[in-house]
Amino acid sequence: MSVQQVCDAYSELRTRVADLMRSITTEQALAVVPHCPQWTVKDCLAHMIGVPEDAINGQMDGVATDAWTDRQVQRHKPDSVSDLLAAWEANAPVFANILPKIPQPVLSQFMFDQTTHEHDIRAALGKPGARESIAIAVSEGFICDSLSRNSDPAI
C-alpha cells in the first residue's frame, strides 16, 4: 500500500468509528471489550485517540508498551464519548500532517492497531461492519509483509 492509501484508510476509519460511537448509549460505551477484557468500549476509543495525541505531543517514551497505552486510557477516564470524539476531531488536521511522515512498517503497524481496535469495539457492541474497508487491506498487507520479513518458522 502507498503512504497515501494508508493515510486515506486512517481518515475513513476515524470517520467510521466516530459515527459508530455517536450512535451508542452511555451503557454501551461501558461494555467490556471481549478481546481487551480490561477495557470498556470507551477505553478502547481512548487508546485509539491517545496514539495520535502522543505522536503530536512527542510523548513516545515507552511507545507500544502496556504502560504507554495505559497512560492514554487513564488520562481520558473522566472524559465522555463526546469529549473523546471532540478531541479526536480537533487533533485530526495536525495528525494528518504527521501521518505521512511516519516510516514504514510503523505506519502500517499503526493502521493495523487502529483497525484491530475498530473491530474490537464492533465486537463489543455487536455491530460488525467495515470488513471490506481499505483499513482491512492495509492491515492484511502489514501482516503479510511482517511474516515475509521474519524468517522464524514458529511465527
Residue ranges with predicted function:
Residues 2-35, 41-46, 50:
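N-terminal "assembly arms/tails" that initiate or stabilize quaternary assembly
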Residues 1-8, 28-33, 37, 60-70, ...:
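Structured surface interface patches that mediate subunit assembly and partner/cofactor docking
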Residues 41-68:
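Conserved alpha-helical segments that form or flank metal/cofactor-binding pockets of metalloenzymes
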